[in-house]
């Protein structure tokens, strides 16, 4: 697929996630990855039920898309063993998605956990 088409796929994915339209989101994920992705989304929504992603930058190639985003939400559920703090969070993430026939076949994400953990009060400010 073209770079433009892959960028549109990623934008639709993020819009579906922000709208909590999980079926729409998963429709663009290869069947072999859907169950794992559904579990990941369940964990995310349990921890940050009001989570929203905002695209900062997006780049694509013939079979991939990379999205740098800001993730915002309120920590209202367990996350990585951290009980709900009810604190707002605002941190950056970058996701690399490999695509085949318009569907995600592999996803890797990296988040600014130092900032996230500071905001949750798990670590002292400036520790990293």
What do these predicted regions represent?
Residues 1-128:
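C-terminal and inter-domain tail/linker signature
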């Amino acid at each position: 697929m073209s770079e433009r088409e892959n960028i549109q796929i990623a934008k639709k994915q993020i819009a579906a996630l922000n709208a909590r339209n999980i079926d729409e989101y998963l429709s663009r994920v290869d069947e072999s990855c859907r169950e794992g992705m559904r579990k990941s989304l369940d964990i995310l929504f349990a921890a940050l039920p009001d989570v929203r992603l905002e695209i900062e930058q997006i780049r694509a190639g013939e079979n991939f898309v990379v999205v740098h985003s800001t993730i915002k939400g309120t920590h209202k559920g367990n996350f990585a063993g951290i009980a709900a703090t009810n604190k707002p969070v605002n941190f950056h993430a970058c996701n690399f998605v490999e695509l085949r026939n318009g569907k995600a076949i592999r996803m890797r994400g990296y988040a600014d956990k130092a900032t996230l953990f500071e905001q949750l009060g798990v670590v002292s400010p400036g520790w990293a």
